[in-house]
């Protein structure tokens, strides 16, 4: 569970960067998405989900909300793509659509 808490903290840091209008390193972001996807994938078919995973998904939601609020920025197109990756992670977790099982096509759009 320590890995999940670490990922949650990293997403909090990403959110703080957004709030400060700092640039986001795409390679760092893609790596974080891949690591998150691997963790989420391990729990997507489970009947019970650890609280830490719920907190991680909640942090992803906060990040995506701040991206949505960033529409006025010159990087809006990028933020929209970042939001699509977050949506893919969340949909995969909740098993809403099999097309979200592979996150790479979404990362390739960045």
Predicted regions and their residues:
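Short terminal alpha-helical segments
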Residues: 1-33
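Charged, amphipathic alpha-helical oligomerization/scaffolding segments
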Residues: 6, 31, 35-38, 59, ...
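Secondary-structure edge/capping motif, primarily at the C-terminal ends of alpha-helices
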Residues: 14-22, 43, 67-71
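Charged, low-complexity interaction regions
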Residues: 23-25, 45-48, 72-76
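Short, charged, amphipathic alpha-helical segments
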Residues: 30, 50-56, 80
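Amphipathic alpha-helical core segments of compact helical bundles
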Residues: 37, 41, 62-65
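Short, solvent-exposed, charged loop/turn and helix-capping segments
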Residues: 39-52
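Amphipathic alpha-helical binding modules
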Residues: 60-110
């Amino acid at each position: 569970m320590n890995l999940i808490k670490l990922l949650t903290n990293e997403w909090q840091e990403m959110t703080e960067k957004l709030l400060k209008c700092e640039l986001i390193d795409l390679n760092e972001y893609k790596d974080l998405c891949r690591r998150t996807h691997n963790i989420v994938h391990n729990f997507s078919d489970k009947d019970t989900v650890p609280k830490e995973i719920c907190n991680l998904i909640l942090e992803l939601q906060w990040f995506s909300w701040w991206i949505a609020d960033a529409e006025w920025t010159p990087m809006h197109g990028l933020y929209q793509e970042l939001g699509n990756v977050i949506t893919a992670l969340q949909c995969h977790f909740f098993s809403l659509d099999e097309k979200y099982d592979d996150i790479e096509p979404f990362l390739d759009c960045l």
